Amino acid sequence: MVDVNRFKSMQITLASPNKVRSWSYGEVKKPETINYRTLKPEREGLFDEVIFGPTKDWECACGKYKRIRYKGIVCDRCGVEVTRAKVRRERMGHIELKAPVSHIWYFKGIPSRMGLTLDMSPRALEEVIYFAAYVVIDPKETPLEAKSLLTEREYREKLQEYGSGSFIAKMGAEAIQDLLKRVDLDAEIAELKEELKTASGQKRVKAIRRLDVLDAFQKSGNKPEWMVLNILPVIPPDLRPMLQLDGGRFATSDLNDLYRRVINRNNRLARLLELNAPGIIVQNEKRMLQEAVDALIDNGRRGRPITGPGSRPLKSLSQMLKGKQGRFRQNLLGKRVDFSGRSVIAVGPTLKMYQCGVPREMAIELFKPFVMREIVDRDIVQNVKAAKRLIERGDDRIWDILEEVIKEHPVLLNRAPTLHRLGIQAFEPVLIDGKALRLHPLACEAYNADFDGDQMAIHVPLSEEAQAEARLLMLAAEHILNPKDGKPVVTPSQDMVLGNYYLTMEGADREGEGMVFKDRDEAVMAYRNGYVHLHSRVGIAVDSMPNKPWTDEQRHKIMITTVGKILFNDIMPADLPYLQEPNNANLTDKTPDKYFLAPGSNIQEAIKNLDLNIPFKKKNLGNIIAEIFKRFRTTETSAFLDRLKDLGYYHSTLAGLTVGIADIPVIDNKQEIIDAAHHRVEEISKAFRRGLMTDDDRYEAVTATWRDAKEQLEARLVETQDAKNPIVMMMDSGARGNISNFSQLAGMRGLMAAPNGRIMELPILSNFREGLSVLEMFFSTHGARKGMTDTALKTADSGYLTRRLVDVAQDVIIREDDCGTDRGLTITAITDGKEVTETLEERLVGRYTKKSVRHPETGEIIASPDTLITEDMAHYIAEAGVSEVTIRSVFTCNTRHGVCRHCYGINLATGDAVEVGEAVGTIAAQSIGEPGTQLTMRTFHTGGVASNADITQGLPRIQEIFEARNPKGEAVITEVKGQVTDIEEDAATRTKKVYVKGATGEGEYTVPFTARMKVQVGDEVHRGAPLTEGSIQPKHLLEVRDTLSVETYLLAEVQKVYRSQGVEIGDKHVEVMVRQMLRKVRVMDPGDTGLLPGILMDIADFTDANRDIVIAGGIPATSRPVLMGITKASLETNSFLSAASFQETTRVLTDAAIRGKKDHLLGLKENVIIGKIIPAGTGMARYRNLEPLAVNEIEVIEDSEEQEDTVEE
């Protein structure tokens, strides 16, 4: 067997007739499948054992030779070789076609490869192949033209005119085959190259396309006549099986039907030829044979598809590969696996961060082989069969063994949809009763799971390596940070937040205020016995907490705090300052001095002078986690998270916060606000009736009035709310709900959207406490339904976007330490108008500098070149007032097929420098695709009629950017650097003209009358600067400026969309994607390189070709960069396996076969498809041959080998 992991590359070419014969084990001559009485395959039929091998292992057809000892013998009676039945999956047969047949992929594909080779139109080809016209093959002495078409009648007339044999004309695929044999590739290519020197327009395009195909034939060694089949391969029978159903009927693969049609027609044709039948009958039979082969290869591509029972189109060879159910996506890229299960999930609040609860019944089934081996090893039973019976009976002894087996054996939990890599994590199983999997509450956010009936799948990693990977790389406790932005993904939520919020509240004049305690135990005891409240401010001796980082003057004093805060600080790591206030100064620096008193001072007085602190909210807890992670890394953080969770749950239970209808406050002046709004609306209507405003203006004013009324109510709510109100506490802490939920309960529901998306002028004045009228209720339903449908559509759209992103970037892997590039990317803060969408500080963290960074005032060097910028350095640089920094960037990286460590920076998921072998492309795609569901679907109206187009936002805008489409509401950009000299308004054509004059020339730009201008007369503009508001068309920008400015523009645009929706994504992820869109160049002038003009090439390949020519002293080629959308970029990848498994499978494979393409297996997808270890992480070549060293463990290793032998028996 071929060892897949030794593969260097994989090539696909056209098969020559001899090649097909060499694959074949015999000719299939009869359309029969199996004999329905004996159920044995028929001789010379589609399932023949002589051709394809025995149906039973080590047994010939007639039963003369049975058992493995006759291995390799061919039976003298039935002619079947004694071997494994598995060969029926690999042995092929063939059918000798009695007439040549054209291959539909090459004749019908777009562009038609046959047509380009012969320089004939696909229509002409169709007429010839399907016997509607003759084609002149060799005119000899006659004035006919070669390749011209003749109808039946013209053909007869010409024969009479010139005499028979004076010229050769044929019809059908054999005519095409003759023409293809006559193509002289070298001469045609030379001729086309000459033509290209002068041709232009449509002619040039056609010449380039022909040249491309002919060149492909010449370079690959494929012969054009192989596009016509003389011999048809028959795929192995086990890949097109026949199964007996229980009713004695048979279910069979459609391919057998299609093959039977071909064989029947072929045999009939053979008989007709033997009988010397009339030409027209033979012709008709040949046409039917052609159609049968077409249907077998690609049913439905031409004409109506051949249908089976129930008029269902039969599934041909092409359909077996295509689409989600095809071979690529169904069986090669994703397989169902053994040792897996699924169940509903329930919450496991008592679990540790690295644990999950697995029901006993499930665990015994999943770990069955391990338990069986252990049972045999302990001599409870003698053999594996008995052990299996023991388990199936449910013997009591198996449970103790199961407990031992699962110890230290991690399992993987996965929740669909797996939008990013945190959708599969490893846990240590803990056996539980019941039938639901138990999930740690903090792991929910990464999975986006809740406990309303979600299900999860569980998988068992079997090999030692898989277990090690699960334990070291995938354990849930390691996944503290989100790969998309480097922020903690395991922030506490709901009850955990509420409990800690309640715990850290402070109250004035609660029982026990002003008491002083000698240490924490005394304080807690007083609280437990009811002498002091959690929220009372009390004193405690600082000396009783010697481990905390106090300053020298704080040490021997008394600190004012609350019992709740003492408990809250108990769970913090010792090196963290004592937390009194929810702010960063207290967290990173020290506890503020105002809380400390000299012993003997009046503590009551001091408490009166201190303001009450606000409690710790969800956001503050997130900051604490981030700080702890920064200082102590994963192990300590995950332990801390468990303590935080337990504390939160405990105290939210004790607090007993409940919600009743009386907790919803009543706003005293609601009626006044609403009356005022009604009055204002009445005035607007009057103004409209008098013709003082347009209908659009009236609509805007009315909706604005009601919005304003709602905001006033909201503001009043916030003013009057009571901090101890449970609903307010939930909202304020970030546990659940926000101000808009609150204002719908207590204020008014406000304006609603109509089914068409337009906002209705009639607001809902009631709130949920008062209750809605029937009409109001009816209005609300529109919005609710729209919300549901939007979500459903958005999920599908977002999933498809992720799929395209993954496909285009899957081969981007960290391949080396440093690429040694001499370019860098100069970055500034990203702004949108006046607003800053992403600060320079955020963009700098975790990147390497390219040039040194100097302090703008003192000139000191803050960071020298090639330094990794930490959070503190980035903060310092921003504080110093540096406005731009040149950094190493993915855009400027020179590594082939990937990125180097220095250009990428830190791995956001770990906070450390990225490792060689990290699959950063896939992570980037997931980071951009996963938040896609949070983006909005709609295109916003920019208030009123001021703009000429609606600005696209949200998901549609992201798709527009990544697919490099022409944006809606396109901005006009200048192609000249210089000054705006004049802006003229032309009322007749309703346009404005903008004049720009510069040193190199001047430009005149026409913009629509309604467009908002971005420039005024006298402004200095650079090339590619927008003159009007709107989105720039990136392809246009690429023509005017360079690649880097397009990349920078696309990066900024993507960030604007995500940041406006409050989603943070690291720049580097967007950089990886954008770089993939610009990795190709189009060759303009080939120079001496021998490249073809007009073809697309990878930048790296183009540079290589040029380098070789320059060394040899020739003229290098010139090219221009090309911006491709992600779908196009995926299909243009160098790997045909990856492209074929993405979309347009047949087109990709047709093209690859003609070119004789080699797939060098550089990406992840191609390797998954052929079952090779992926070239990321430890699968990279540089790590491939590492041998584990045994250190004083020789005995153990020998021991384990013996144990393995017992399992195999």
From Swiss-Prot:
Binding, Mg(2+): D450, D452, D454
Q: Which GO terms describe its biological process?
A: DNA-templated transcription
- Provide any one GO MF term from the record: magnesium ion binding
**Enzyme Commission numbers on file:** 2.7.7.6
> Any note on cofactor binding?
Binds 1 Mg(2+) ion per subunit.
Obligatory cofactor(s): Mg(2+); Zn(2+)
Enzyme type, top EC level = transferase
Keywords of the record: DNA-directed RNA polymerase, Magnesium, Metal-binding, Nucleotidyltransferase, Transcription, Transferase, Zinc
Binding, Zn(2+) 2: C819, C893, C900, C903
Function noted in UniProt: DNA-dependent RNA polymerase catalyzes the transcription of DNA into RNA using the four ribonucleoside triphosphates as substrates.
Kindly give the NCBIfam families that the UniProt entry links to this protein.
Answer: rpoC_TIGR
Complex formation: The RNAP catalytic core consists of 2 alpha, 1 beta, 1 beta' and 1 omega subunit. When a sigma factor is associated with the core the holoenzyme is formed, which can initiate transcription.
Query: What family is it from?
Result: Belongs to the RNA polymerase beta' chain family.
- In Swiss-Prot or TrEMBL terms, this protein is called DNA-directed RNA polymerase subunit beta'
Organism of provenance: Streptococcus mutans serotype c (strain ATCC 700610 / UA159)
